[in-house]
Swiss-Prot record:
GO terms for molecular function: 2',3'-cyclic-nucleotide 2'-phosphodiesterase activity; 3'-nucleotidase activity; metal ion binding; nucleotide binding. InterPro entries: 5'-Nucleotdase_C, 5'-Nucleotdase_C_sf, 5'-Nucleotdase_CS, 5_nucleotidase/apyrase, Calcineurin-like_PHP_ApaH, CpdB_N, Cyc_nuc_PDE_nucleotidase, Metallo-depent_PP-like. This is 2',3'-cyclic-nucleotide 2'-phosphodiesterase/3'-nucleotidase. GO terms for biological process: nucleotide catabolic process. Substrate binds at residues 450, 554-559. It is an enzyme of class 3 (hydrolase).
């Protein structure tokens, strides 16, 4: 039987004490075996087709995952199928659907797929809120299964905005062939930070609550109402850091909440169980458990499915979980580079109309480009994929600024970040690749991945410098005296989409200094300053001078980077950043014949000299196209020195120049 302490109630602070406890699964004989099959972070990657490259792929797609789902369920007598959110956004199929809306009986293709596969229940991810609450409500109505979320409440109340949980009665067959009724409770969670990320869509309508506290509130209620077991559908990532109220990544903390029997989690686009977590004090990657509780996270874009097997024994009229194990089943083997799953015929046929419509939608011509736009070097030097976005944002603001008093006469800058630059160092193919010549809406979607809107903030020169210091956390500190290999990019501690390049000013990064801020833009080295030679129009930036910075709603409302947050916002555009980019390409092409995306090289690294044996390395795409681009466009001498275990090409960069 599970060695687990059952509390009626635990306080928020006691979670720290409980974190030291390890719940161990006893290897007992089970009466009923129950399999939970799960998907997470599908992001409307429904087909095995890359719409950005207009080519098929065997590395992702729900059509392939569906065949693994059917296989996993066919192997056992008792199974349930659940989805963990971030379903309806993230792919050109989703963009096409959002552009069409639900008029004339049109339905959401992602929901259609889950309906066809007979999902039992789903939950919401943070990206479900990107298109607004009305669009989300229309999508939820189409689901033939309940969608649960417990920690989003109606503004100004504690009343759940969505159905917080459900308890479903399921007929199960025991190991002797006898049928029983098992009551399975499902509860859903989303990161509280949606109130920042989608503030424009949510403010005044909903509020969020802490994930762990919400679990402590509802799970005992679910047990009182008869739930034999409780499954948490937690759209939140893992963390071994001490629990803090309001944490974005709370999946591991849920293992401390009494009566939760399994946790399906996601959000961070990682894999669990996986060797990445081998050193986690909370995780058992052999059995797929956290503090004894089965937990699983199935990557992203339907590239994996979670399979969680629970053993249950009936004791005095109650079902008790006596064993649990979680594994992942990938659709593609990264090491052998072989597909492990075929397309499911039913789902493939279901998606054929929307697949063809999406290809047509993203193939709309919008203009021409004079040069290739690849993001292979976006973390190393000024980059064309960011340059063109910043050009578009700046041009847009230049049009609206004169009519808005708070903006008139101020210098206009623009901030952009690489959305596709190797993922979280988990995707060697995850780079923006837009060829010169004819451009289509597909290319605009590749250049600007998210359905953000443009927002303008007003910041001082001092805040501008600190903003760039936050971005400088992308890089590890370089020891100028060492002759050992040193990694340049801090993949583990920093997300590439937080590496803002600000156009309109010039600046340099001194990488021999420690980072002033960490990956969450928290001050860690107050005496360190990496940003040097910051100038505007050739003159040093005055710390007290005011600037307008065009950015996106995610960054502007986040209040994470200096110069952002409510008090700095002077203009919030109703237009999507991607559409602004497409319109800019179209208007410029019509006027000048094409757009010129060549980077203006407004930022660079301070040369590190005096050590001929300095060995600094970075990772990027292993493709021949990338190698050719690097040979032609690199601002620094670079040479490939190997390939890492994930498949990234490893380059050595000469930072003395």
């Amino acid at each position: 039987m599970m060695n687990r302490r059952h509390f009626i109630q635990i306080s928020a602070t006691s979670i720290l004490a409980l974190s030291a406890n390890r719940f161990a699964m006893a290897k007992g004989k089970s009466d009923v075996d129950l399999r939970i099959v799960a998907t997470t972070d599908v992001h409307s990657f429904l087909t095995d087709f890359d719409y950005y490259k207009d080519a098929p792929t065997d590395k992702f797609g729900f059509t392939r995952a569906a065949s693994l789902i059917r296989q996993a369920r066919a192997e056992v007598k008792n199974s349930v199928l659940v989805d963990n959110g971030d379903l309806i956004q993230g792919n050109p199929i989703a963009d096409y659907q959002a552009a069409q809306g639900y008029k004339e009986g049109k339905s959401n293709p992602a929901i259609d797929c889950l309906n066809a596969m007979n999902y039992e229940v789903g939950t919401l991810g943070n990206h479900e809120f990107n298109y607004g609450l009305n669009y989300l409500a229309d999508a939820i109505k189409q689901a033939k299964f309940p969608i649960v979320n417990s920690n989003v409440v109606k503004a100004g109340t504690e009343e759940p905005y969505f159905t917080p949980y459900v308890i479903q009665e399921k007929s199960v067959v025991d190991n002797q062939g006898k049928t029983h009724k098992l009551k399975i409770g499902y509860i859903g969670f989303v990161p509280p930070q949606i109130m920042v990320w989608d503030k424009a869509n949510l403010q005044g309508k909903v509020e969020t609550r802490d994930i762990v506290k919400t679990a402590q509130k509802y799970v005992p209620e679910m047990k009182k109402k008869g739930a034999d077991i409780v499954v948490a559908l937690a759209h939140t990532g893992p963390s071994d850091e001490p629990y803090q109220e309001g944490a974005e990544n709370s999946a591991f903390y849920l293992a401390d909440v009494p009566h939760i029997d399994a946790v399906i989690f996601g959000h961070s686009h990682r894999l669990f169980p996986n060797k990445e977590f081998a050193k986690s004090p909370n995780a058992d990657i052999v059995n797929g458990t956290v503090k004894g509780i089965p937990e699983s996270m199935a990557g992203y874009w339907a590239n994996n499915i979670s399979v969680v097997d629970l053993g249950l024994t009936e004791h005095k009229g109650k079902w008790i979980v006596t064993s649990g194990k979680a594994v992942l089943r990938p659709i593609y083997d990264i090491e052998t580079k072989k597909a492990l799953a075929k397309n499911d015929p039913e789902i493939t046929a279901l998606l054929k109309p929307v697949h063809e419509a999406t290809r047509k939608y993203v193939s709309q011509p919008i203009g021409k480009a004079t040069d290739n736009m690849y993001s292979y070097l976006a973390l190393l030097q000024d980059d064309p994929t960011i340059q063109i976005v910043n050009q578009a944002q700046k041009a847009y603001v230049e049009k609206v600024a004169p009519s808005i008093a708070a903006m008139a006469g101020l210098p206009i800058l623009s901030a952009g970040a690489p959305f596709k630059a190797g993922g979280r160092k988990n995707d060697p193919t995850g780079y923006t690749e837009v060829n010169k010549g004819k451009l289509t809406f597909r290319n605009a979607a590749d250049l600007y991945l998210y359905p953000n809107t443009l927002v303008v903030v007003k910041a001082t020169g001092e805040q501008l410098k600190e903003w760039l210091e936050c971005s400088a956390g992308m890089f590890k500190q370089i020891d100028p005296t060492s002759d050992k290999p040193q990694s340049l990019i801090d993949w583990e501690g920093f997300r590439t989409y937080n590496f803002d390049v600000i156009d309109g000013v010039n600046y340099e990064y001194d990488l021999t200094k420690p980072a002033r801020y960490d990956g969450e833009c928290k001050l860690i080295n107050p005496e360190s300053h990496r940003v040097v030679n910051l100038t505007y129009q050739g003159k040093p930036v005055d710390p007290k001078a005011e600037f307008l910075i065009a950015t996106n709603n995610y960054r502007a409302y986040g209040n994470k980077f200096p110069g952002t947050g409510d008090k700095h916002i002077v203009y919030a555009s109703p237009d999507e950043s991607r559409q602004i980019l497409a319109d800019y390409i179209k208007a410029t092409s019509e006027k000048e014949g094409s757009v010129n995306p060549n980077a203006d090289k407004n930022w660079r690294f301070v040369p590190i000299t005096g050590n001929d044996k300095l060995d600094v390395r970075f990772e990027t795409s292993p493709s021949e196209q990338a190698a050719k681009f690097i040979a032609e466009k690199a601002q620094y001498p670079m040479k490939q020195v190997g390939t890492d275990e994930i498949g990234f090409a490893v380059y050595q960069i000469d930072l003395s120049k």
